[in-house]
């Protein structure tokens, strides 16, 4: 698998991807995160997008459909598409730290998701810290 640099005009292509996500029937909200969201892409950057979907029976099929269309729109296969419905708490926390909202059909539902995700993450991080301390001190 070889890495391909993002198109030089990636910033000009993003609005069309945003429109696609805003109009996709399953997408409730979406974030751009990572180096592009920070406005600091590097030569090794990819496009990091996180989506939350509703009314989906097959998450994998929906992800592949959306990913395929985003590849066409953004003219690259260097896209990391994350389904927030099924991903882990540390990755959700990473998305929440550095993101740009690019689709938001149901702001109240998004707010509830963000609040619950952050509370769960902080509860998890406290438990994780305790477990690591025990492991470190007890070998």
Where are these regions (language model features)?
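Catalytic core of pol beta-like nucleotidyltransferases
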Residues: 1-29, 37-39, 43, 54-139
